[in-house]
Swiss-Prot record:
GO terms for biological process: DNA catabolic process. GO terms for cellular component: cytosol; exodeoxyribonuclease VII complex. It is found in: Cytoplasm. Heterooligomer composed of large and small subunits. InterPro entries: Exonuc_VII_S, Exonuc_VII_ssu_sf. Disulfide bonds: none annotated. It catalyses: Exonucleolytic cleavage in either 5'- to 3'- or 3'- to 5'-direction to yield nucleoside 5'-phosphates. Its EC number is 3.1.11.6. Keywords: Cytoplasm, Exonuclease, Hydrolase, Nuclease. This is Exodeoxyribonuclease 7 small subunit. It comes from the Bacteria. It comes from Synechococcus elongatus (strain ATCC 33912 / PCC 7942 / FACHB-805) (Anacystis nidulans R2). Belongs to the XseB family. Pfam families: Exonuc_VII_S (PF02609).
Amino acid sequence: MAKAKPAWSYETAIAEVEQIVQQLESGELPLAEVVEQFQQASQRLQQCDRFLRDKQAELDLLIESLDEPPVPPQ
């Protein structure tokens, strides 16, 4: 039976990027691995950017709704 892929997590993605950066900074990876790791980090950062933009839009809508006058009870 195939394993279910865990749900995406911002915190996990950032931890993966930090781990990749540590590997890159070690200077011990062959060039092909450096390029592959850099691509993975770039993809994770793009995912994080989309996530943060979406959450910012949600927050903006919530804040905007706070500025609206309350609806009187019927």
